Swiss-Prot record:
Role according to the record: Catalyzes the methylthiolation of an aspartic acid residue of ribosomal protein uS12.
An annotated GO cellular component: cytosol
Presence of keyword 4Fe-4S: yes
Cell compartments where the protein resides: Cytoplasm
EC category name: transferase
Lineage: Bacteria, Pseudomonadati, Pseudomonadota, Betaproteobacteria, Burkholderiales
Residues covered by the TRAM domain: 391-463
Keywords: 4Fe-4S, Cytoplasm, Iron, Iron-sulfur, Metal-binding, S-adenosyl-L-methionine, Transferase
Protein name in UniProt: Ribosomal protein uS12 methylthiotransferase RimO
Length: 463
């Protein structure tokens, strides 16, 4: 008599990804490899055989969130592997911070450590044996599992940073710059577009420095030589994206002179005229205390030239208020810069004395209430500038990528224009279409006429 043998239950792994988009891409690599090896995923801690927590360790709030999440996973599951930036931080006792706070975790790794995480998984939850799954090649460097909606994805081009800004501890956690081979980056981009991605967000710790570590050596893609450098990379990305009608958006672009070469290419429409530039401050003395890698003395002039070359350019930036030693005059310089530069989207942090940051030892540490007060004043000016620039768009017709459209958009929806990166910028609220035949589909583009401004967002009618 033949007996049917029930298939063995495949091991399940829970995954929590905290922090920035760069950490998200690390999580995607881990999940891709887990999937290739036959592991299944669990949406709950209780339903998993093991939980992986990818942490953030940059600012105090992020550290607390990461430690709390690890604690929750331990309480609800008991078997936890920790990876990410917090895994590389030392505690007050000199040992590993995570192990000091949660000694029962199974393993701790730093960021960008897919193989170390997989080794820890194998040690604590042996991979399922499947003669078919075992033939599947690894998913490193290709468009594997994605944690973003299907129509947009992050493309990480490098890991680490060569700079030693006094307020930052990222190099101590993620190491020096390591650029991905240009052929691998372009192959992943092509695969993402073929898979339906309509917006590619290029990320790294320092996008402008892409290729510095390999002396801009020439790589190959599609049988053609391509230099490992930001300009050649984005030019080729634009060419790959064009047949798909897809967007390419640049993030974390330090204001080096090389950026000037990219702006005219943005003006052609091959990549989005959108630049995420972390200026951090405007006053030369503050920038010197920060040890910023690019001189800021001529940033205002450069921005004016950028806008002349590409009038549609949108600039997003982040700043720090209340840096040690910052005078009221230096802070006013920053507010004046914000107004004159007409920064479209600006975020601001009150200086936080992160453990291990060199800036903590600088003279002139300001009281927290002063730092927070300056941050609030900064954001008030930033809001004025942003809303005024949004108002200029009323009456214009823009292409909008639809992110949300219940009932095919008959009651309206939500999307983003080229000026809006997901999660960090505003959105475009789409009114119900006037034409009955007009439908809105998530992940598709629609033309819309801007009819109003609502806070940091636009209101538009699909046409």
């Amino acid at each position: 008599m033949n007996e049917t043998i029930a298939p063995a239950r495949l091991p399940r792994i829970g995954m929590v990804s905290l922090g920035c988009p760069k950490a998200l891409t690390d999580s995607e690599l881990i999940l891709t490899q887990l999937s290739a090896e036959g592991y299944q995923t669990s949406k709950t801690f209780e339903g998993a055989d093991l939980v992986i927590v990818n942490t953030c360790g940059f600012i105090d709030d992020a550290v607390k969130e990461s430690l709390d999440t690890i604690g929750e996973a331990l309480a609800e599951n008991g078997k936890v592997i920790v990876t990410g930036c917090l895994g590389a931080r030392a505690g007050e006792g000199g040992g590993n911070l995570v192990r000091e706070m949660h000694p029962s975790v199974l393993a701790v790794t730093g960021p960008h450590a897919t193989q170390e995480v997989m080794d820890a998984v194998h040690q604590n939850l042996p991979k399922p044996h499947d003669p078919f799954i075992d033939l599947v090649p690894g998913g490193f460097g290709v468009a594997g599992v994605k944690l973003t909606p299907r129509h947009y994805a992050y493309l990480k081009i490098s890991e680490g940073c060569n700079h030693r800004c006094t307020f930052c501890i990222i190099p101590s956690m993620r190491g020096d710059l390591v650029s991905r081979p240009v052929g691998d980056v372009l192959s992943e981009a092509k695969a993402l577009f073929e898979g339906g991605v309509k917006e590619l967000l290029v990320i790294s710790q320092d996008t402008s420095a892409y290729g510095v570590d390999v002396k801009y050596r020439t790589g190959f893609w599609d049988g053609k030589p391509v230099k490992t450098r930001m300009l050649e990379l984005v030019q080729t990305l634009g060419e790959i994206a064009e047949p798909y009608g897809a967007w390419v958006r640049l993030h974390y672009v330090y204001p080096y002179p090389s950026v000037d070469e990219v702006i005219p290419f943005m003006a052609t429409g091959k990549i989005l005229p959108y630049l995420d530039v972390p200026f951090q401050h405007s006053h030369p003395d503050v920038l010197r205390r920060m040890k910023r890698p690019a001189s800021g003395e001529r940033n205002l002039e450069r921005i004016q030239r950028w806008r002349e070359a590409c009038p549609e350019l949108v600039i997003r930036s982040t700043f720090i208020a209340g840096f040690p030693g910052e005078t009221e005059e230096e802070f006013q310089h920053l507010l004046d810069f914000l107004r004159e530069a007409q920064i479209d989207r600006a975020g601001c942090f009150a200086y936080s004395d992160v453990d291990g940051a060199v800036a903590n030892e600088l003279p002139g540490m300001l009281p927290m209430e002063v730092r927070e007060e300056r941050r609030a004043r900064f954001m008030a000016v930033a809001e004025e500038v942003s809303i005024e620039r949004l108002r200029r768009r009323v009456g214009a017709t823009m292409q909008v990528l639809v992110d949300h459209a219940p009932a095919l958009g008959r009651k309206g929806g939500r999307g983003r224009s080229y000026a809006d990166a997901p999660e960090i910028d505003g959105v475009v609220h789409l009114l119900p279409p006037e034409k009955i035949s007009k439908q809105l589909k998530v992940g598709e583009f629609t033309r819309a006429q801007i009819v109003g401004v609502q806070g940091h967002d636009l209101v538009a009618r699909p046409i």
